[in-house]
């Protein structure tokens, strides 16, 4: 995580690489890679995910800003039969947003537009990666009036 601020600029970025990141409210999970036929005991392989984002805001009274984000499912690295978790059929997600806020003492008024696109597909059992993807897009507009004390 990096962050830079001064009188006019706010710049922040973060990148995460991890396995089974569902406990951090991110995409991820695990897959069953082996089942002992005698005891029924299962072996698991975690889904590896990478996620990065960048946020840049400029100004004092009027503050335009942009947000860019990307998440990628890197698979399990092992052959798996079934996946458990959050968004296990998502290959990648791209997010881009623009915002404009007006800031005065104790008040913030703003408008934000965000476009998100997720590529869904089916699991490749040889490595837990997602194949045969198609994208779904979401448009979001948010308005805010915030009193700060």
Region roles according to the model:
Residues 5, 103, 135-137:
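Solvent-exposed loop and beta-edge segments used for protein-protein assembly and interaction
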Residues 130-134:
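Short proline/glycine-enriched turn/loop segments at secondary-structure junctions
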